[in-house]
Amino acid sequence: MRRPSAPRASALRALAHRASAVLAGTLLLAALAAPAAAPAAYAAPATAYAASAAAGDENFTIKDPRITESSGLAASRQHPGIYWTHNDSDDGPYLYAVDSRTGDTVARLTLTGIGTPRDVEAISIGPGNRIVVGDIGDNLDGTWPYVWIYELPEPRELKDATVKATQYEVTYADGARDAESLLVHPKTGRVYIIDKKEDGGHLYAGPEKLSVSGRNVFKPVAPIDLWATDAALSPDGQRLAVRGYFGGIDYDWNNGVPKRVARLNVPLQRQGESVTYSADGTKLMYGSEGESSDVQARDARGAAGKGSNSSSDGGSSTGAGKDGDGTSGGTVKVGAVALAVACAALFGVSRVRRRR
């Protein structure tokens, strides 16, 4: 990723916070490695699970050694069981199609017709099987006067190919900012972005239709109570899932003014960066960065018409912290110990930063 020569203090804080989150995630995973008895969480009906498993919508590992910073995830509706992903930065104009049944890459697309990507953070699929990619990251917290969105048709045949994409220039009505979450409404095709702020950000709505002439101004329409690393709309456009490093929030879409419903039981991962609904909407698939990164499936609210993997908070904007607790059932005790260790580590890191 290209960066200015003189980073600002706020930018350094943002990078330090991200490093702290990764450290905490590592400590949490280590602590949770110990076995713990836990009652079974909600399980979708067997018929729904069987169908989902047949499509590959279950846990898998991304095996491709070229994918070391999987920062976005999108389920293909045209190719069941296939998930599109990309690296965070310093990789080039590439998208990867991963078969969730095997973890193998079955296609790599090289995008043409665009500039050099800076910090690609998100991917989504809209109506007509149009892939939309968000080159919207800004680790220097508002350095770039504009960011980019790329749009391309999803190939009907999965193989390595060069695909021409359309590039859109994007600005924000209230100034430049960092963002890692992009979503496309599955019915209208309208593009939305959620900015990434530690104390919570906003949902930004783009124009009804993006334009290649001039800049597309995204406007804030609703607050999001999360330090968001990714978000996804359900295939029917009725639900919004937003995740952070250690938790997430389940919203009703509510015609573009999201209404908080519950906390999401987000799995603990090395560096939780991505989320997408499975093509049939019964699963939420959570991805992580790193070599051989894992993608973990959880039942989505309303899976097969029953149940939820969310913890209701009555629509509250608080609950167990802005990121949620990411725990459930018998894992709470072990998670509490892990969280204490992680908090101690984060406290130490913050003290070191203050002394500097």
Residue ranges of predicted features:
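Sequence/structural signature of beta-propeller domains
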Residues: 2-21, 25-356
